[in-house]
Amino acid sequence: MAQTIRNPVEWVVDEIREVAGGVGQAGRSLQHTSTHLFSRPLTVSRITVADLKEVLTKGFDDFMAYRTDIIFLIVVYPIISLLVVAASFRYELVPLVFPIVSGSAILGPFVGVFLYEMSRRRELNLQRHHIDNHSWANALSVARARNFGKIMMLGMLLVVMYLLWLVCAWGLYQATQGPTTAESVGRFVHDLFLTQGGWWLIIVGCGVGFLFAVAALVTTVVAFPLLLDRDVGLGTAVLTSIRAARANPVPIAAWGLIVAGGLILGAIPLFIGLVIVMPVLCHATWHLYRKLVPRHHDA
């Protein structure tokens, strides 16, 4: 089918209208959020650890189709680089570098919502039209989602949880290392690994961080994809995540270990691996949701 060359002015006007429509729909979604907290409970499925292999395979397939590593390379890596550079000049920030980066496990479910939408759109196009549409523009459809307000509200809860984690991390540092900051990165590393207080900081800090990560995982493992996929209440989405984790403790624990291990391995080579690990895990989360929540069998 022949395509006509459009007037650039007309194209810009249409794009502005589309964005305005998305903003308007987002506003209506925010109003809808306040009156739609709980809805009918949903059925959750039992899965096995072996199912996680299929989930990761499909996530990697979406990653290769969209090449979302480029998005993370453009957006995420410069942020991490700026953080490291800032820490190198302001030594008081050094103790927060690890908590800030490791806290991505808390914010990850919210940050990944755009990639969930990309996987959802690709899945729909393959099923309905047998077309592999993998445009980056699919990510922008999140702003027009009927549950956009609920997604943002749940995301803000994770942001609050992330900030609480940073406050706890800083409090633990001061409790174990004193109120003064290290004079250099080398001094910080020395105090961390060669003093009793440093080892207490590592042990207790990892334990507290683990609790924050588990809380984020259990409450949001399917919540964000569910809000993208169906018109359900925010409370129902969170409760469905909790029920899915309760019904599948071993697979969900294994998934949490995969996420943690992937983030650690991705961060080792100067954080470069995160531009691959993070988008693959985000895409895979959509397919994990598909495994855990049946499409047409609600309770």
State the predicted function of each range.
Residues 1-299:
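Hydrophobic alpha-helical membrane segments
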